[in-house]
Amino acid sequence: GILGEFDALPGLSQTNSPFQEKALNSNGAGHACGHHLFGAGSAWAAVMIKQWLIETKTPGRIIFFGTPAEEGGSGKVYMAREGAFENVDIMFHWHPSSSNQANSSTSNANKSGKFTFKGISAHAASAPDKGRSALDGVEAMNMMVNMMREHIPQESRIHYVITKGGLAPNVVPDLAEVYYYVRHPDRLVVKQLFERVVKAAEGAAMGTETKLSYEVMHGNYSLMPNDTVQKLLHSQLSAFGGIEYTAAEQKYAEQIYETLFEPSLKLGDEKKIMPYKQSHTYGSTDVGDVSWLIPTAGIRTATWVPGTSAHSWQAVAAGGMSIGLKGMKLAAKVLTASATKIYENPEIIVDAKQELASRVGEDFKYEALLGDRDPPLDYRVN
């Protein structure tokens, strides 16, 4: 199987100009994580693999999985929970990046929730004693969570944004909402931390005499590496090599590079294949859940100017011109070539499944971090 994504990010519209320039679209969204390339490149690879299977009369099956709402919606988790990936032996994925690599990577698990406080509105000056501020509930919760940071595992990450806080200073707000993310490499720690965040919310509601409700929005497992498949991808990526810019692309890249804040890579790194190593990313992805069920491996290709951060206007810009397309084409070629090796050497599947079984342990039973809730089709609406 090959995973594809296609969702954009709100507030990051951008033309393909090397200078910050908002695109005129209806919702202000932009492909700052390159999922337009991800989805198209994966579909392209699936078509090429199918063609190869037919032409060579090789027995096998290829499935392209279009997966929605990776950016906070955990689309793959619902698919995994409902058995959409059953009968798949190996799963490939890839992701746009500013470098070319096929590392054996882990990630943070995460879980999110929206916490809503309801109070009593009143005139903030003439009758404040008659009101109960929902915003006070949010702020009290945030204060307790911020104090909690001293007493959580070092690798944890907790972020929040206040999505509703009232409309006028002279009105005691009767509705307020805060949106929380909790992350850690261990999904069980994430589960525990989220429960502590809920307790902080409950305490805040009690202390401010407001009413609390909350909704789990999403939850992802950490990435489970599989060296058996990952090393195959690395060998194929190394065989194809990196990205070569034309003179026009080089000039464009130089202009983009000048706008980057403390870039970690240099111009020219797009030509390189990064050495194979174990790595950890502190972000999260719903590919994680898939990787605990099926041997899963992926690559990153330089669809952006070296040093570009994901979720930036620079990523949107490069992803909308030939640099992005070159990275996408490289990914499609690598996935296709790697798949043919597996069809020709089915013992890879046996080894990959044995590795996965040893990593997850014999007692592992999959339970989605987001529970049994239905997909939040409006999760971007605040």
Predicted regions and their residues:
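Histidine/acidic-residue-rich, glycine-tolerant segments that coordinate divalent metal ions
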Residues: 9, 20-30, 36-37, 53-173, ...
